[in-house]
């Protein structure tokens, strides 16, 4: 089984960017820990980050037929990008939306997601652990789909 982790704008600055909101772990460390966990679960994990909307769309489209699920922290694009939504829906790849912070306890503009209604699940507010929970959720979803439960 293969998953793709996509991180959007400004997530490359984790560890320095507003640590009271996003925590002190770097994206590199989060990805390393998630890859270790994925390997233990028998999942190959590819990681990708970009600050560019078009590059993220290209990445999603290129995943078609290559991955079983997408874990996506679209950052601010969560609230604004019809292009990311359309790319995710056009591939038909199941995806989990995830966020480090609890977006529902923040500014009103962060409380609306253009991705959430079609995601297989949403994980928000658990800091770096949100990534691990998203991995677990996607894996459980795919296993239940295969077993028909």
Curated annotation (Swiss-Prot):
Homododecamer. Pathway: Metabolic intermediate biosynthesis; chorismate biosynthesis; chorismate from D-erythrose 4-phosphate and phosphoenolpyruvate: step 3/7. It holds the Pfam family DHquinase_II. Catalyzes a trans-dehydration via an enolate intermediate. This is 3-dehydroquinate dehydratase. Belongs to the type-II 3-dehydroquinase family. It comes from Prochlorococcus marinus (strain SARG / CCMP1375 / SS120). The lineage of its organism: Bacteria, Bacillati, Cyanobacteriota, Cyanophyceae, Synechococcales. Keywords: Amino-acid biosynthesis, Aromatic amino acid biosynthesis, Lyase. Its EC number is 4.2.1.10. The record marks 17 as: Transition state stabilizer.
């Amino acid at each position: 089984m293969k998953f793709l982790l996509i991180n959007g704008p400004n997530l490359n600055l984790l560890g320095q960017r507003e640590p009271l909101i996003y925590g002190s772990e770097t994206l590199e460390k989060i990805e390393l820990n998630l890859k270790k966990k994925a390997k233990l679960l028998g999942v190959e994990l590819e990681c990708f980050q970009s600050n560019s909307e078009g590059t993220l769309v290209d990445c999603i489209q290129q995943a078609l037929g290559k991955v079983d699920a997408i874990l996506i922290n679209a950052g601010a694009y969560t609230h604004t990008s019809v292009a990311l939504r359309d790319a995710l829906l056009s591939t038909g790849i199941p995806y989990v939306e995830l966020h480090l912070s609890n977006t529902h306890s923040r500014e009103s503009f962060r409380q609306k997601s253009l991705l959430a209604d079609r995601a297989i699940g949403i994980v928000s507010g658990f800091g770096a652990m949100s990534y691990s929970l998203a991995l677990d959720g996607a894996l459980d979803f795919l296993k239940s789909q295969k077993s028909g439960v």
